[in-house]
Amino acid sequence: MEQDLARIEQFLDALWLERNLAENTLSAYRRDLSMVVAWLHHRGKTLATAQADDLQTLLAERVEGGYKATSSARLLSAMRRFFQHLYREKYREDDPSAQLASPKLPQRLPKDLSEAQVERLLQAPLIDQPLELRDKAMLEVLYATGLRVSELVGLTMSDISLRQGVVRVIGKGNKERLVPLGEEAVYWLETYLEHGRPWLLNGVSIDVLFPSQRAQQMTRQTFWHRIKHYAVLAGIDSEKLSPHVLRHAFATHLLNHGADLRVVQMLLGHSDLSTTQIYTHVATERLRQLHQQHHPRA
């Protein structure tokens, strides 16, 4: 079993070198694949002897055990990449994962906010306090750019150009993109940089654009707590919330106002257009709701 676990680490090292995956993604692969190895060894199998039927049985047991389809899909993705790696490295003469059936995933629409709800959320921070001025600038940038929360908290001073009104983002797979900020976000960034950030740093030298109260890089979890705090103040239902709620609103509202789908794809940093297309369903659903509410024959 130790040898199989060592092969997982070799695979993760290769992934990190080739694809520059985030640590969270690598940790998820490690957990899933370690579980696969333990499951196989419990049945007298190894990575070298496992067959497609074994892996399909494992997936079936997960479904019967009440695991969500998304969890099974993630596990299947990990197994496919791993066994493809073992095949390329000539540790195996075949790839048993190639025969596995994919679980059917329910299409879930992203949680979105109306433009009025977003406006209330953006107005929630008290801008006369440095900490909340930082949060105000972060919310404005998030809605103006559609960044992922991890991208937002990772921004540095050198990533923004207020003169040009753009932000440079290093997204998934280490892909770089330039995203316009818009006048409102630029204004609040300028205000924050003059009246908020110096107070937060308190003499500490750090390149992070949005430091925490301890003059360190803020975590995604911390910012998520801040969003929930302001949502309560704005009277927004918690069911409407997710860490990426403003990213979803950014995409949906752009499409509602006639933006081209491929432009939205580029701004969001999606490598696959199908990932962006789900926002068209959100926009369509919003139109359907409005029709039902206001049309006399709906």
Swiss-Prot record:
Pfam family, one: Phage_integrase
Subunit structure comment from the entry: Forms a cyclic heterotetrameric complex composed of two molecules of XerC and two molecules of XerD, in which XerC interacts with XerD via its C-terminal region, XerD interacts with XerC via its C-terminal region and so on.
Regulation: FtsK may regulate the catalytic switch between XerC and XerD in the heterotetrameric complex during the two steps of the recombination process.
Function: Site-specific tyrosine recombinase, which acts by catalyzing the cutting and rejoining of the recombining DNA molecules. Binds cooperatively to specific DNA consensus sequences that are separated from XerC binding sites by a short central region, forming the heterotetrameric XerC-XerD complex that recombines DNA substrates. The complex is essential to convert dimers of the bacterial chromosome into monomers to permit their segregation at cell division. It also contributes to the segregational stability of plasmids. In the complex XerD specifically exchanges the bottom DNA strands.
HAMAP family: Recomb_XerC_XerD, Recomb_XerD
Similarity section: Belongs to the 'phage' integrase family. XerD subfamily.
Entry GO terms, CC: cytoplasm; Holliday junction resolvase complex
Xref: CDD domains: INT_XerDC_C
Localization per Swiss-Prot or TrEMBL: Cytoplasm
GO molecular function: DNA binding; tyrosine-based site-specific recombinase activity
Residues annotated as catalytic: 148, 172, 244, 247, 270, 279 (o-(3'-phospho-dna)-tyrosine intermediate)
InterPro entries per the UniProt record, alphabetical: CB, DNA_brk_join_enz, Integrase-like_cat_sf, Integrase_catalytic, Integrase_recombinase_N, Integrase_SAM-like_N, Recomb_XerD, Tyrosine_recombinase_XerC/XerD
Domain Tyr recombinase, chain residue ranges per copy: 108-292
Gene name of this polypeptide: xerD
Organism: Salmonella typhimurium (strain LT2 / SGSC1412 / ATCC 700720)
Biological process per Gene Ontology, one example term: DNA recombination
All copies of domain Core-binding (CB), residue ranges: 2-87
Annotated protein name in UniProt: Tyrosine recombinase XerD
Major localization listed first in the record, in broad terms: cytoplasm
Keyword vocabulary terms for this entry: Cell cycle, Cell division, Chromosome partition, Cytoplasm, DNA integration, DNA recombination, DNA-binding
